[in-house]
Amino acid sequence: MDMDNQNTKIYTDKFLAVTSLLFVFISVAGLAIYSQESIKIAATWMQWTTSVFTTPVLLFAFLAIIFTFGLAFSKYGKIKLGEGKPQYSTMSWIFMFILSGIGSSTLYWGFLDWAYYYQTPGLSLPPESAEALKYSVAYSFFHSGLSAWAIYALASISLCYSYHVRKNKGLSLASVIEAVTGFKSTGVVGRLVDLMFLLCMFGALTISLVLTAVTFTNILSQLTGIPNTFMTKVIIILAVSVLFALSSYVGMDKGMQRLSHMVCLGVVLFAIYVLCFGPTQFILNNSLMSFGLMATNFVDMSLFTDPMGDGKFTREWTVFYWLWWISYAPGVALFVTRVSKGRTIKEVIFAMVIGGSVGLWFIFGVFENYSVYSFIHGAVNVPQILSQQGGEVAIGQLLSLLPAGKLMMWIFLGIMVVFLAAHMDAVGYAVSATCTRGLSEGQDPSPNARLFWCVMLTLVPIAMIFSKAPLDTMKTATIVTALPFIVIILIQTYGLVKWLIQDYAKVPSHLIEQQGYDDQEIGLNQTQDEHAKRMQLELASSIKLDRKTS
């Protein structure tokens, strides 16, 4: 770390923290006091926003894939993000940012996502038909695959480049916006951006935390007879917060790494168990067919606006999912930036888009197809239970059918708790980093700040549980907070393109690659000016050499 970084004053932006909490407390009070009115307003707002912004959201997600893969395969993909060797092993690195990007509700959607699409299918298919069932898992693969992770990559690369290559101080969105537009991160625009980010994190975490708490307490009640009440759910949420606190105090290097390894290993082993002791042949066959259906219909799924119909599926699922991923994108970008020093742009893009997609396809392929098989053979009527009793009841019944069912239910609960703690750790880090001014490369917000924000992040989900808000209301919390970030990510991307052209447009591909090797060996720690001068000298040497040989 250079002297300039060491002398930077680190402090908490109290105005930003207090303002964001004020908004949160008002929202919580509204949900608690005016529950039914809030639910009705949320339903109206969701209908309007998803109808108006369908086309822009679909185009944004589709173009994100084109841009990120184009960047990865270009010469700019060889640019190294920071000097020296990577701080984390490749496996730990991938585990950590995958967990920052997917919530513990993945275990909920992993068993039930297909059932929603079976009841209300896309591509104008008849509801609850053989065709709807055929495409149900394919659509789940689509919503958890390339487009989603490309959105994360698009938001992450610009922040990584600003922080590690351009050496812009401050690990927050406002710092990037300041570097691109000139608006001060501590000014009105900068604070508005960070305020929207903080509120976005509260909205994004709501669905994950609520679905996890509801599923956990239902299965726990089946196993132990403990009443499945509001207080039980609150106790579970607070218990997870304590686990998160332990992770925060241990630190990023030990706490988050350990949690991420525990979760990923636990989920993979659990999926392998279901694959081996469940309907193995059906799971493999339907997973392969679903992947093929997704691949052959990818463009149709990406751009399906349903102008001849009511567009309900696109609004309620594809647009919702893309906005949910967008709502998490800024937080994921902050976390990915923190753990990606020493990686190349291509490595970050491929690890996120390919690694993240394949990981979720495996999990969803196993869990969903086990659920589909149970439905087809009459063991568990998942769609009916989902509609009448709730998805958490269906998951409990599905788990109980496995060999050593009760043991598997306990293991599932353990994985779910650690999964949520790891996810909250990542989100808490992003939020506390945003409220901490002056962070330079390699510096982290204090454990106390991360713990404080973790507790605050539980307020909105607890209010949702108290008001018995339906899934659509929780979706609205995500959608409303996510929309502005399409514009912010586009501004980040504009800045990234501008910086790449300024810094590397005239630098040959082999010199960019060579610089990465040199930095890894020497461990250079250059400022922007030193970096630019070095590039100019190498370019001049290359031109002279070409002239001599010609």
From Swiss-Prot:
Keywords attached to this entry: Cell inner membrane, Cell membrane, Membrane, Transmembrane, Transmembrane helix, Transport
Record has tRNA processing as a keyword: no
Stated role: Catalyzes the energy-dependent uptake of carnitine and is essential for growth on carnitine. Can also mediate the uptake of choline. Is probably a proton:substrate symporter.
A single GO cellular-component term on record: plasma membrane
InterPro entries in UniProt: BCCT_transptr
Subcellular location, record wording: Cell inner membrane
Bilayer-crossing regions: 15-35, 53-73, 92-112, 137-157, 196-216, 230-250, 263-283, 317-337, 347-367, 401-421, 451-471, 477-497
Keyword flag Cell inner membrane: yes
MF annotations from Gene Ontology: transmembrane transporter activity
A Pfam family: BCCT
Inactivation phenotype: Deletion of the gene abolishes growth on carnitine as sole carbon and energy source, but does not affect growth on acetate.
Name of the protein in its database record: Carnitine transporter
Activity regulation, per record: Inhibited by the protonophore 3,3',4',5-tetrachlorosalicylanilide (TCS). Not activated by osmolarity.
Protein family according to the UniProt entry: Belongs to the BCCT transporter (TC 2.A.15) family.
Principal cellular location given in the protein's record: membrane
Membrane topology recorded in Swiss-Prot or TrEMBL: Multi-pass membrane protein
Species the sequence originates in: Acinetobacter baumannii (strain ATCC 19606 / DSM 30007 / JCM 6841 / CCUG 19606 / CIP 70.34 / NBRC 109757 / NCIMB 12457 / NCTC 12156 / 81)
